[in-house]
């Protein structure tokens, strides 16, 4: 197992840096094309239909055909839009999606034409904070798209998206705090190296579950796709977009899905380390093999996205915000205090007490989550009290019928 030497970053020749940047871009684009096709195929199987099956063998070229179609369609700019902002919004949305992947480690140290390099474009001492900052910029594109469209539905979708990102970005950042405590670094390659013996999904299970919930809300995917809810907002923030501009929004959505899936792999599933029992093979974590393990883990999370979309209904807006503010954030804060205490005990030589505290803390955290969830369910299931006749707005008398203003109850009695 060869972990990248931190001194390698920034010393690659220019052609190797360019090759790695192009490689990351191609990896993301191919993943998006495959994810769209597989999503449609899997949803088709879930709904007892075939899915795409006309373009290419078994429909394998459907995503490519859709991309070409969108690129060649006529671009229509509605009247009344703020044109410069309207055209700039898709670009602001898609560029941060690609930039965030620059610090994701996709493998260990390899040799390319005699040059030792890491399968990672670059790394920073605060790489995870860089990812959080860059992904937060993408929401500006959504908000500006809603504002510049000059329509009510896109504006509501943009405002929903901004509130959604603010709410779930806090929970996502809190889930990372425990990882920073255990790894002792915010560098992505350092966090992967710290998981050589044990993945953090086993040590920090509550943090992992909070992150998985937050990443679905962060990327505006079902059942948290409120900014583009078709039944409420037609198409949400991209209602007024078509052709290549609409394709850029869709590209940004799927690239963001890939990025947060890769971040989950890096933070909790050991990054590019081979899973057990493959890790028993001596060469599993050397050479180009780690790229395969990394890609497989990313696809596990992408399948979770597809699975959730095909099985869960969309939440109401108040339910969605309540989950973020009333459950995820309080649970994360309680779990951080438990992990910080356990980490202090471990560093002072009380490993047994630390392990027991983590186990008890996990149980207590799940108990707190259940209590908060039941409280929210009780508030959501409250019945509306029956209204008396005095509370009902009176119905004006109908022409041709005698009598004063009637309530619905009196009308039913009279009609009967």
Curated annotation (Swiss-Prot):
Its EC number is 7.1.1.-. One of its GO terms (biological process) is aerobic respiration. It is found in: Cell membrane. GO terms for cellular component: plasma membrane. Signal peptide: none annotated. The chain crosses the membrane at residues 16-36, 84-104, 124-144, 165-185, 197-217, 260-280, 288-308, 320-340, 353-373. GO terms for molecular function: NADH dehydrogenase activity; oxidoreductase activity, acting on NAD(P)H, quinone or similar compound as acceptor; quinone binding. It catalyses: a quinone + NADH + 5 H(+)(in) = a quinol + NAD(+) + 4 H(+)(out). InterPro entries: NADH_UbQ_OxRdtase_su1/FPO, NADH_UbQ_OxRdtase_su1_CS. The keyword NAD applies. It is a multi-pass membrane protein. It holds the Pfam family NADHdh. Keywords: Cell membrane, Membrane, NAD, Quinone, Translocase, Transmembrane, Transmembrane helix. NCBIfam families: PRK06076.1-2 (NF004741), PRK06076.1-4 (NF004743). NDH-1 shuttles electrons from NADH, via FMN and iron-sulfur (Fe-S) centers, to quinones in the respiratory chain. The immediate electron acceptor for the enzyme in this species is believed to be menaquinone. Couples the redox reaction to proton translocation (for every two electrons transferred, four hydrogen ions are translocated across the cytoplasmic membrane), and thus conserves the redox energy in a proton gradient. This subunit may bind ubiquinone. NDH-1 is composed of 14 different subunits. Subunits NuoA, H, J, K, L, M, N constitute the membrane sector of the complex. PANTHER family: NADH DEHYDROGENASE SUBUNIT 1, NADH-UBIQUINONE OXIDOREDUCTASE CHAIN 1. Belongs to the complex I subunit 1 family. This is NADH-quinone oxidoreductase subunit H. It comes from Mycobacterium sp. (strain JLS).
